[in-house]
Swiss-Prot record:
<protein>
    <recommendedName>
        <fullName>Small ribosomal subunit protein uS9</fullName>
    </recommendedName>
</protein>
<dbReference type="InterPro" id="IPR023035">
    <property type="entry name" value="Ribosomal_uS9_bac/plastid"/>
</dbReference>
<dbReference type="InterPro" id="IPR020568">
    <property type="entry name" value="Ribosomal_Su5_D2-typ_SF"/>
</dbReference>
<dbReference type="GO" id="GO:0003735">
    <property type="term" value="F:structural constituent of ribosome"/>
</dbReference>
<comment type="similarity">
    <text>Belongs to the universal ribosomal protein uS9 family.</text>
</comment>
<dbReference type="GO" id="GO:0003723">
    <property type="term" value="F:RNA binding"/>
</dbReference>
<dbReference type="GO" id="GO:0022627">
    <property type="term" value="C:cytosolic small ribosomal subunit"/>
</dbReference>
<dbReference type="InterPro" id="IPR000754">
    <property type="entry name" value="Ribosomal_uS9"/>
</dbReference>
<feature type="region of interest" description="Disordered">
    <location>
        <begin position="98"/>
        <end position="130"/>
    </location>
</feature>
<feature type="compositionally biased region" description="Basic residues">
    <location>
        <begin position="111"/>
        <end position="130"/>
    </location>
</feature>
<dbReference type="InterPro" id="IPR020574">
    <property type="entry name" value="Ribosomal_uS9_CS"/>
</dbReference>
<dbReference type="GO" id="GO:0006412">
    <property type="term" value="P:translation"/>
</dbReference>
<keyword id="KW-0687">Ribonucleoprotein</keyword>
<dbReference type="InterPro" id="IPR014721">
    <property type="entry name" value="Ribsml_uS5_D2-typ_fold_subgr"/>
</dbReference>
<keyword id="KW-0689">Ribosomal protein</keyword>
<dbReference type="Pfam" id="PF00380">
    <property type="entry name" value="Ribosomal_S9"/>
</dbReference>
Length: 130
């Protein structure tokens, strides 16, 4: 018999997370490692669990994540976005609570590109009067 699983893709900055939810005890595995081993800060782990708290499904699903690109914060928020989308696939009734918490919206903020003649996106070279 095929095991039930729900999939969701989350994105944030340059990070892309492919999330699979499987009925289980609430274990979160990111790129083959436990989430506490993979993410260095407790605040990121709390951020990542937000969709489960909003839908009151904490401990109902095991989460298997494949994430790449970006840094820790972008990856954690991409995982959060993916979990929210996968939960929506599991039960469409979660939509209103997830939407109210802002978990279904892809954060559009990206790094601004570097412009020619400047050191960074907006930082200009040091000005010398003489």
């Amino acid at each position: 018999m095929a095991q039930v699983e729900y999939r969701g893709t989350g994105r944030r900055k340059n990070s892309v997370a492919r999330v699979r939810l499987v009925p289980g005890e609430g274990n979160i595995t990111v790129n083959g490692k436990d989430v506490r081993e993979y993410l260095p800060f407790e605040s990121l782990i709390l951020d990542l669990n937000q969709p489960f708290e909003v839908t009151e499904t904490k401990g109902n699903y095991d989460v298997l994540v494949n994430v790449h690109g970006g840094g820790f914060t972008g990856q954690a928020q991409a995982i959060r976005h993916g979990i929210a989308r996968a939960l929506l696939e599991a039960d469409p009734e979660y939509r209103s609570s997830l939407k109210r918490a802002g978990l279904l919206t892809r954060d559009p903020r990206m790094k601004e590109r570097k412009k020619p003649g400047l050191k960074k996106a907006r930082r200009s070279p040091q000005f010398s009067k003489r």
